[in-house]
C-alpha cells in the first residue's frame, strides 16, 4: 500500500515539474528553432501555391531579425501583435504576395514597401496610421488594400496609379471626402468608406464603372447623388445611417439592386436610418419594386 502511495505521489509530482519547466522554457517558435540550431526556414509552410510564415498574436513589439533573411516568403502574417514600427528591411522580402499587418500599433509604413513588387494583398487595418507613403503606389500588382480603422484623412494622389486595385477599405477613418485618386481606379469592385466624416459623394463616383459593392454607411451624407445611379454594376449599395432626405428618380437605373436590404451582408439597397421625407419611409418599406415604380411615375409627372 505504501509503495503504491509512493508511486502515486511520484506520478503526481512528475507532471507538476514538467509544467513548471514548460513555463520556464516557453520559447517562441523562432527562438526554439534558433536555440536548437535549426534553420529558421524550417518554420516556413509550403502550400500548393505559396510559401507562408505566420507570427499571429505573439505579443511581439519588434519583428525578429532573422525574418528578413527568409526571401522565399510569399504570405506573411504578423497580425494582432504590438508592433510600432515596420522596419525598412521589409523591402528585402521581394516575393511577398500577401502581407497582413492588421491589429498592431503602426503609425507609418516605410518607403521600402515600394520594393514589394509582387504584393497583391495588403492588410494594415486596425493600426494608428496618420498617413500612407506615396511609394506604396509603386506596388502596381496590388489588388486588395485594407486601411480601415486608422487615423487617415487623405491618400496620396499617385494612388491613382494602382490600376489593378479591386478592393479598397477606407472605413473608420477621418476622411471628409472620398479621395479623388479613388475615382481613377477603374478595376475597383469593392469600396468601403463607412464611418468617416463624409457629407457628400462626389459626382466622379460615376467613373467607377466596375463597382459592385459600395458602402458609405455611418457618415453625414446629405444627398443621394444622381451620378451614383449611373454606376449600374452596383449589387450592394449601403447608405444606412446618414442624413439623406430624398431619393433621385434615376434610382431605378440600378437594376442589379434586387431588394431593399436589412441584413448588412445582403445584396440590395440599404437605406435605413435616414430622415427620408420623399418618398415616404412607408413606401421604402414596401420594397424595391414599389419604390422604383413610384420614382419612375414621379419622373414623368
Swiss-Prot record:
Keywords: Leucine-rich repeat, Repeat. InterPro entries: Leu-rich_rpt, Leu-rich_rpt_typical-subtyp, LRR_dom_sf, LRR_domain-containing. It holds the Pfam family LRR_8. The keyword Repeat applies. Gene3D superfamilies: Ribonuclease Inhibitor (3.80.10.10). PROSITE patterns: LRR (PS51450). One of its GO terms (biological process) is intracellular signal transduction. Disulfide bonds: none annotated. LRR repeats lie at residues 72-93, 95-116, 118-139, 141-163, 164-185, 187-208, 210-231, 233-254, 265-287. PANTHER family: LEUCINE RICH REPEAT CONTAINING 30, PTHR48051. This is Leucine-rich repeat-containing protein 30. The lineage of its organism: Eukaryota, Metazoa, Chordata, Craniata, Vertebrata.
Amino acid at each position: 500500500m505504501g509503495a503504491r502511495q509512493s508511486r502515486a505521489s511520484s506520478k503526481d509530482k512528475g507532471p507538476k515539474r514538467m509544467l513548471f519547466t514548460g513555463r520556464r522554457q516557453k520559447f517562441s517558435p523562432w527562438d526554439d528553432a534558433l536555440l536548437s540550431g535549426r534553420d529558421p526556414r524550417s518554420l516556413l509552410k509550403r502550400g500548393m501555391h505559396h510559401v507562408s510564415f505566420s507570427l499571429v498574436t505573439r505579443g511581439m513589439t519588434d519583428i525578429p531579425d532573422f525574418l528578413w533573411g527568409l526571401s522565399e516568403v510569399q504570405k506573411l502574417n504578423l497580425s494582432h501583435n504590438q508592433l510600432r514600427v515596420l522596419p525598412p528591411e521589409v523591402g528585402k522580402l521581394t516575393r511577398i504576395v500577401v502581407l497582413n499587418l492588421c491589429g498592431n500599433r503602426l503609425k507609418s509604413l516605410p518607403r521600402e514597401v515600394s520594393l514589394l513588387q509582387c504584393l497583391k494583398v495588403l492588410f494594415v487595418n486596425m493600426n494608428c496610421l496618420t498617413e500612407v507613403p506615396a511609394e506604396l503606389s509603386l506596388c502596381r500588382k496590388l489588388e486588395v488594400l485594407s486601411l480601415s480603422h486608422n487615423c487617415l484623412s487623405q491618400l496620396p494622389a499617385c494612388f491613382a496609379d494602382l490600376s489593378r486595385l479591386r478592393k479598397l477599405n477606407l472605413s473608420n477613418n477621418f476622411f471628409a471626402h472620398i479621395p479623388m485618386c479613388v475615382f481613377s481606379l477603374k478595376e475597383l469592385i469593392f469600396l468601403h468608406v463607412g464611418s468617416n466624416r463624409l457629407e457628400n459623394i462626389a459626382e466622379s463616383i460615376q467613373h467607377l464603372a466596375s463597382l459592385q459593392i459600395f458602402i458609405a454607411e455611418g457618415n453625414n451624407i446629405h444627398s443621394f447623388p444622381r451620378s451614383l445611379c449611373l454606376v449600374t454594376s452596383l449589387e450592394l449599395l449601403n447608405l444606412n445611417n446618414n442624413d439623406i432626405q430624398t431619393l433621385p428618380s434615376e434610382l431605378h437605373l440600378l437594376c442589379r439592386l434586387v431588394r431593399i436590404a436589412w441584413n448588412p451582408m445582403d445584396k440590395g439597397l440599404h437605406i435605413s436610418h435616414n430622415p427620408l421625407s420623399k418618398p415616404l419611409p412607408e413606401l421604402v418599406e414596401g420594397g424595391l419594386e414599389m419604390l422604383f415604380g413610384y420614382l419612375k411615375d414621379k419622373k414623368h409627372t
